Amino acid sequence: MNPPFSDKNHRCLTSPFASAEATQQGAHRFAPPPYFDGQRYHSINTWLKRKCGEKTIKLAIDGGFTCPNRDGTKGVGGCTFCSDNGSGEFASNIEDQIRLLSDKWPHARYLAYFQNHTNTYAPVAELRKKYEAVLANPKIEGLVIGTRPDCLPEDVLELLSEINRKHFLWLELGLQTIHEETARAIHRCYDLRVFDRAMEALRERGIKAVVHLILGLPGESREMMLDSVRYVSSKPELFGMKLHLLNIVKGSQMEYLYPDYQPFDSIDAYVRLVCDCLERIPPEVTIHRLTGDAPRSILISPPWSFNKRTILNGIHDRLHLLDSWQGKRCE
């Protein structure tokens, strides 16, 4: 499938929402393209529905992996924002998830999401066994694998290339920020050059890459966060982006920063920043997340972040108010 807005020379010049008639007359009427589903950004849900013809759902699973930033190889305790469970608080059994979802979406298609910790951090034989066991389920049509850019050795890349030739696949890379001072503060334990090499390696093999950024890390200004968005957006191989609202959660090292540090003082402040970010992301890049999603049982701050629908509605309303859209100000 050719990505929408694939003409990079013109992708940021006109609103993708303006009808031809409205553009000619200078009017302010909108005819959203079908793949936006009435949204002003290019959501992964819309992309998947166009590609697969049905609603496609990611099923979060725990592959039993750890992380080099936890086992002593690079560090212990993980990144400072990470809880004991990594990023996969909602992971559960595949069949249980399908059973719960099938009544509401009887024709849905499913991707298995290896989410917790670093899901390429194991001997390649072990990785093959785990990936193939999941793909053996006839209801699973592909994989989504969360990992670190420094955990993609050559033999793992070859395995991923093999899977990519036979099944649907994308990798999710936890970058969080491009700023080295912040990276050291959050104990990320790799530098930006490692990320650049990983993106190039995935591009060479035709493997889709989704990059995670965190908004609200201590010490980062609005402009620093926008710099991270611009840098990642400049990667020609970028398939998608996740913008995470920093959640301070129980069990993380950041827990001890609260209440002296809070990521944002209001929903409105966060919504404004997300809209600024979306304007700088090319419109063909798929958007996989625009907020945080920590369970209430472990969330410390910000207390409003579990109100996901209010945040997303706020983003939609502000983009509409500004007559703006994803990619309007991309460079």
Language model: regions and residue ranges:
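Hydrophobic faces of well-ordered beta-strands that scaffold small-molecule active sites
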Residues: 57-61, 110-113, 143-145, 169-173, ...
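Structural recognition of alpha->loop->beta junctions
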Residues: 79, 136-140, 227-243, 312, ...
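Auxiliary Fe-S-binding modules of radical SAM enzymes
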Residues: 2-46, 54-55, 240, 247-331
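Distinct, well-ordered alpha-helical segments
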Residues: 124-132, 153-162, 225
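Acidic (Asp/Glu)-rich catalytic clusters
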Residues: 101-105, 131-138, 160-168, 200-204
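N-terminal [4Fe-4S]-dependent radical SAM core
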Residues: 2-111
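Conserved C-terminal portion of the radical SAM core fold
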Residues: 193-252, 268-291
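Core AdoMet radical
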Residues: 85-97, 101-124, 139-152, 168-194, ...
